[in-house]
Every structure is written in structure tokens, then in C-alpha cells.
Amino acid sequence: MTKPSNFDPFDALSSAYETMYEHVAGGLHAATHKTGPMIQELIDEAEAKVSDLQDITEEDAKKLATWLKRDLDDAINYVTETEYALTDWLGFETALIKASFINALLETADPTTLALLRMKENAHEPYIYRTGEITGFGTLICDECGEKLHFHEAGKIPPCPKCHETSFHRIQTD
């Protein structure tokens, strides 16, 4: 069976990313004891599940798991290190995001839970987001010109529409 001529493999990866995110958010919401290692365990489970159920390679599933961990880690770091809300990290109104995704994230993103999940010993330099990777919802800022790219669902990171740079970051803490 051949794939349709309009088939976009990044659409499949975006869909798989969202499936993985839903699994992790659902697991966090249901858990009574939330820990950093538990998040990694949920991401690993989601990686195996999406590799089995969707038409993506194990290599792509591993990349998606890495990108999902990066996105969750960035959100957790931002909310726990600032006085700002998750909507500030996103960089736009949450009304633009599918309700199921934002509800799952907000239900698990209370400050107490996030504080428990934040592991200071694993502090890191800010993540660099590159063209061609998949990212979840939120705002990326071009490292070259400061242009903001808004993602209202998981999607492939394009080059900057203003300067064509391929390196981005999320809103950073002070």
C-alpha cells in the first residue's frame, strides 16, 4: 500500500508527539506520588506505546521522547523558577490550544507538583530548539532576530519566517 502523495511524515510525528504527551499528562494526573523519575518512566512508556501503535520508526519515537522531555522540562523549569504562570511560558492565550491538552497540563501543573518534579541537581543550560524538530505548544523565539513562532499544537519547527535562522529558544527565566 502506498502513501498518498500529500502524506507529510511530520504530520505523523506531530500526531505521535501529541499521543505521547497525552499519555504522560494522563499518567501524571492519575499519580498520587509525582517524581522526576516517574515522568521519565511515563515518557519511556509513551515512547514504546507510540512505536507499537503508530507508523513511526523506533528512531523517530526516541527523538519524540527526547523532544517531549525537553518541552516538559522547559515548562517545569519556567514555572518553578519564576512567579509567572504557565500561560506566560506558552506566550499566548490558552484558548488557542486544544482543550484536552491544556487541561491535562494545567491539572498536573500546580506549583506544588511542579516543585516536586523539578530536580535542581539536573539544572541545565537552556534548550536549543532547531528547525526540523517537533515541538509541543508554546512560543519559540528566534536566536538571531527575536521573531516569535507560536505553536498551538505539536508541529515541525520551521526556519524563522523573518531571517531564516534555524535556532530558537523558549521564554527564559530571569
Explain the meaning of each model-derived region.
Residues 102-174:
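Cys/His-clustered metal-coordination modules, chiefly Zn-binding fingers
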Residues 6-128:
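Long, charged N-terminal interaction/targeting segments
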